[in-house]
From Swiss-Prot:
It comes from Callithrix jacchus. Heme binds at C443. This is Cytochrome P450 2D19. The keyword Cell division does not apply. CDD domains: CYP2D (cd20663). Responsible for the metabolism of many drugs and environmental chemicals that it oxidizes. It catalyses: an organic molecule + reduced [NADPH--hemoprotein reductase] + O2 = an alcohol + oxidized [NADPH--hemoprotein reductase] + H2O + H(+). It is a peripheral membrane protein. Belongs to the cytochrome P450 family. Induction: P450 can be induced to high levels in liver and other tissues by various foreign compounds, including drugs, pesticides, and carcinogens. Its cofactor is heme. Keywords: Endoplasmic reticulum, Heme, Iron, Membrane, Metal-binding, Microsome, Monooxygenase, Oxidoreductase.
Length: 497
């Protein structure tokens, strides 16, 4: 094809792209549509957002456009919600209309389909409701909120403390041990298994989980979701979500092994067996969400989300204890007064430990590990804070803007446990405390996370005093964003009390 022939083709393509772009811009001209930066033809606002630090970009845009502003990612309309009032109005008051998830085209490479969408990214509909009900009821049957699961967590905390003690007061990074301990709690619920901390299968799952987290952020992911036709470029699809694919493959081996020990005649011992029992009941029903593909996705969701968020929060907790030794000493004094140094902590102790409870909540608020939550999508036209948001709009909820809003917190950018204490020293929880999001899609693992955070944290502070290693600089209190916010790498010394 000669150069003369290419020119008309290029002009035609350019006109087509501009027409499509204009068609997607029409809603920006509607009355009361949220303001936002002017999108570029074809790209929209992809270049206006730093996807390596999305929360910071959103906070800058908030200062310019207000609590409710709009973006256009290629041709995908997006509205970002900031502040308690806007987030609560959208997720709670209009919860039924904002409970959907936007399509994520690249997840098709992980086995997503109409009846296999897992839990967290599933579209709001019968399949999601079925799996949400199943997961909540099964976790409750397996001991969530009961003494049996509490004892399992406390037993794992004993193993964790022993692993800390092995370092004999020498400097080490606690993250890996925290990952392993929390993973064992999830493994016990999903496949009735406890891993030794040096088990190759566990180490492989943890490595792939952390690598998979990095694949949840970045410009390439957003571009491919906004322009999925690019996935047809030869070789590109194979390079996307490599770690998440490998994680599912490793998990498949674990589930296949566990499946061989399942006895359908016996009551389910874990979530996997309960899922297999439901598969037997719904066999022959093509509309059921109980199928092999969804088993892997549901277990993967529970394992990765349940492990990572709690483990990272505990890592933040220990970091903040070595940065604030006065707070650490006060927590330990309360532990000594209520529990002592011999008896294991129990959930019943929490009622009598307002300061420790306040510290754990302040760790969650300050760490702000899921700053943007998970995206939502409107299922009908709605109004939020006086702005009209059309059906099919992707919603980002800037939870960071709620957890660190100067209108709701006395010292939003400082670690200050008194945020959760009244004048009499009693624990209080402000309504702006939303680390688990809110509404119909709020984190279903919140009760488990609360139990793990209290029991692991108090067990560690009961047994050890933590400090910055001698000769090392003071660790940074600033986190690193990669969908979740993790502490900057640090070491500590754990000295037996």
């Amino acid at each position: 094809m000669g150069l003369d022939a290419l020119v008309p083709l290029a002009v035609t393509v350019a006109i087509f792209v501009l027409l499509v772009d204009l068609m997607h811009r029409r809603q920006r001209w509607a009355a009361r549509y949220p303001p936002g930066p002017m999108p570029l033809p074809g790209l929209g606002n992809l270049l206006h957002v730093d996807f390596q630090n999305t929360p910071n970009s959103f906070n800058q845009l908030r200062r310019r456009f207000g609590d409710v502003f709009s973006l256009q990612l290629a041709w995908t309309p997006v509205v970002v919600l900031n502040g308690l009032e806007a987030v609560r109005e959208a997720l709670v008051t209009r919860g039924e209309d904002t409970a959907d998830r936007p399509p994520v085209p690249i997840t098709e490479m992980l086995g997503f389909g109409p009846h296999s969408q897992g839990l967290f990214l599933a579209r709001y509909g019968p399949a999601w409701r079925e799996q949400r009900r199943f997961s909540v009821s099964t976790l409750r049957n397996l001991g969530l909120g009961k003494k049996s699961l509490e004892q399992w967590v406390t037993e794992e905390a004993t193993y964790l403390c022993a692993a800390f003690a092995d370092h004999a007061g020498r400097p080490f990074r606690p993250n890996g041990l925290l990952d392993k301990a929390v993973s064992n709690v999830i493994a016990s619920l999903t496949c009735r298994r406890r891993f030794e901390y040096n088990d190759p299968c566990l180490l492989r799952l943890l490595d792939l989980t952390m690598e998979g987290l990095k694949e949840e952020s970045g410009l390439l992911r957003e571009v491919l979701n906004a322009i999925p036709v690019l996935l047809r470029i030869p070789g590109l699809a194979g390079k996307v979500l490599r770690s998440q694919k490998a994680f599912l493959a490793q998990l498949d081996e674990l589930l296949t092994e566990h499946r061989m020990t399942w006895d359908p005649a016996q009551p389910p011992r874990d979530l996997t067996e309960a899922f297999l029992a439901e598969m037997e009941k719904t066999k022959g029903n093509p509309e059921s969400s109980f199928n092999d593909e969804n088993l892997h996705l549901v277990v993967a969701d529970l394992f990765s989300a349940g492990m990572v968020t709690t483990s990272i929060t505990l890592a933040w907790g220990l970091l903040l204890m070595i940065l604030h030794p006065d707070v650490q000493r006060r927590v330990q004094q309360e532990i000594d007064d209520v529990i002592g140094r011999v008896r294991r902590p129990e959930m019943g102790d929490q009622t009598y430990m307002p300061y420790t409870t306040a510290v754990i909540h302040e760790v969650q608020r300050f760490a702000d590990i899921v700053p943007l939550g998970v995206t939502h999508m409107t299922s009908r036209d709605i109004e939020v804070q006086g702005f009209l948001i059309p059906k099919g709009t992707t919603l980002f909820t800037n939870l960071s803007s709620v957890l660190k809003d100067e209108a709701n917190w006395e010292k939003p950018f400082r670690f200050h446990p008194e945020h959760f204490l009244d004048a009499q020293g009693r624990f209080v929880k402000p309504e702006a405390f939303l680390p688990f999001s809110a509404g119909r899609r709020a984190c279903l693992g919140e009760p488990l996370a609360r139990m793990e955070l209290f029991l692991f944290f108090t067990c560690l502070l009961q047994r050890f005093s933590f400090s910055v290693p001698a000769g090392q600089p003071r660790p940074s209190p600033h986190g690193v964003f990669a969908f979740l916010v993790t502490p900057s790498p640090y070491e500590l010394c754990a000295v037996p009390r």
